[in-house]
Swiss-Prot record:
Pathway: Cell wall biogenesis; peptidoglycan recycling
One GO MF term: kinase activity
Enzyme superclass (EC): transferase
Coiled coil regions, renumbered to chain: none
Full protein name: N-acetylmuramate/N-acetylglucosamine kinase
Transmembrane regions: none
Source organism per UniProt: Neisseria meningitidis serogroup B (strain ATCC BAA-335 / MC58)
Physiological role: Sugar kinase that catalyzes the ATP-dependent phosphorylation of N-acetylmuramate (MurNAc) and N-acetylglucosamine (GlcNAc) at its C1 hydroxyl group, leading to MurNAc alpha-1P and GlcNAc alpha-1P, respectively. Is likely involved in peptidoglycan recycling as part of a cell wall recycling pathway that bypasses de novo biosynthesis of the peptidoglycan precursor UDP-MurNAc. Is able to complement the fosfomycin sensitivity phenotype of a P.putida mutant lacking amgK.
EC number: 2.7.1.221
Reaction catalysed by this enzyme: N-acetyl-D-muramate + ATP = N-acetyl-alpha-D-muramate 1-phosphate + ADP + H(+); N-acetyl-D-glucosamine + ATP = N-acetyl-alpha-D-glucosamine 1-phosphate + ADP + H(+)
Pfam family, one: APH
GO biological process, one term: peptidoglycan turnover
Amino acid sequence: MQRQIKLKNWLQTVYPERDFDLTFAAADADFRRYFRATFSDGSSVVCMDAPPDKMSVAPYLKVQKLFDMVNVPQVLHADTDLGFVVLNDLGNTTFLTAMLQEQGETAHKALLLEAIGELVELQKASREGVLPEYDRETMLREINLFPEWFVAKELGRELTFKQRQLWQQTVDTLLPPLLAQPKVYVHRDFIVRNLMLTRGRPGVLDFQDALYGPISYDLVSLLRDAFIEWEEEFVLDLVIRYWEKARAAGLPVPEAFDEFYRWFEWMGVQRHLKVAGIFARLYYRDGKDKYRPEIPRFLNYLRRVSRRYAELAPLYALLVELVGDEELETGFTF
């Protein structure tokens, strides 16, 4: 509440001659919160509150300028010392909200194709040396969240010697081909919850953790989501659509689609291991229970993919030992 009062006082200095109502709008998985300031004439802005003792708004401001080729929120005012940023208001309707309201496959595909178009535009603008690299150390730190948080906390187990061997074999097999993929700008959380339904182009949110990394990463984030799931044939068609657009745009994807699909699936393994660990950490460390029920979806993704590739047999064996081989119940599937 103290932060909200401080934000309101700051906004009164930014808009000294305008009355406004300040209401809660949204919260992220980290410490950021968003409020909507609605003025007497009905117009509104969105205010980011990022406590400076917990995080800096500097990465957000840097990437916001870098990603100006897509429809990111415009920064109207900012105070980096206080951790406050005023943004133009892109509305309330995320792609996820729109999809849950309109559950037809045709409507979902239309939205996802819009998102893919924006992703290609973002990737076309990529330049080396601008963003931090998505390197081996980062990938390794991320996937180690799986044994550290999912296995240790969610399952309450410690890997046996044999299981540690299976895990190490997985890491040694998985990371080299991912690191060998051509690199582009990676949003890192390009999901339907972070895309806004706006007039014209989709709004793109939550980009502050962007890196320079594997070209298939953001497509995996979009099509193998935490909160909504589509049949594999539907996803396959959209991966093909992306691959065709990427080739036409001159992006560095393989000429053979089956090779690109392998990139996509293996990249998904890294992301799914990471997210399962993060969702467990959000619950056990941070007390946030919103994400924990979606962990089974990532376990299903992981089992399906690791079953398909002989090289990933150690991961499949480990998953079967830890959580069995039955499909786990999840939320929305289309």
